[in-house]
Structures are given as C-alpha cells and as structure tokens.
C-alpha cells in the first residue's frame, strides 16, 4: 500500500543520510 511505499522511502532516506555521515 501507499504506507508501505512511504516506509520504504523513509528507510532508504535514512540509510543514505547515515552513509553520508559515516563518510565524513
């Protein structure tokens, strides 16, 4: 459903942000 898509996008976003922070 729409909520699952939102959850997936949020997870991917957090993963990306965490990756950027880890690279610094």
From Swiss-Prot:
Please give the organism: Ascaphus truei (Coastal tailed frog)
Q: Which UniProt keywords apply?
A: Amphibian defense peptide, Antibiotic, Antimicrobial, Secreted
Which family does the UniProt entry place this protein in?
Answer: Belongs to the ascaphin family.
Reported function: Antimicrobial peptide that shows higher potency against Gram-negative bacteria than against Gram-positive bacteria. Has a very week hemolytic activity.
Instruction: Answer whether the UniProt record assigns the keyword Secreted to this protein.
Output: yes
Task: Write down what this protein is called.
Answer: Ascaphin-3
| A GO CC term assigned to this protein in UniProt | extracellular region
Tissue-wise, where is it found? Expressed by the skin glands.
Q: Which domain of life is it from?
A: Eukaryota
Query: Could you tell me where this protein is found in the cell?
Result: Secreted
Is-annotated flag, keyword Secreted? yes
Single Gene Ontology BP annotation: defense response to Gram-negative bacterium
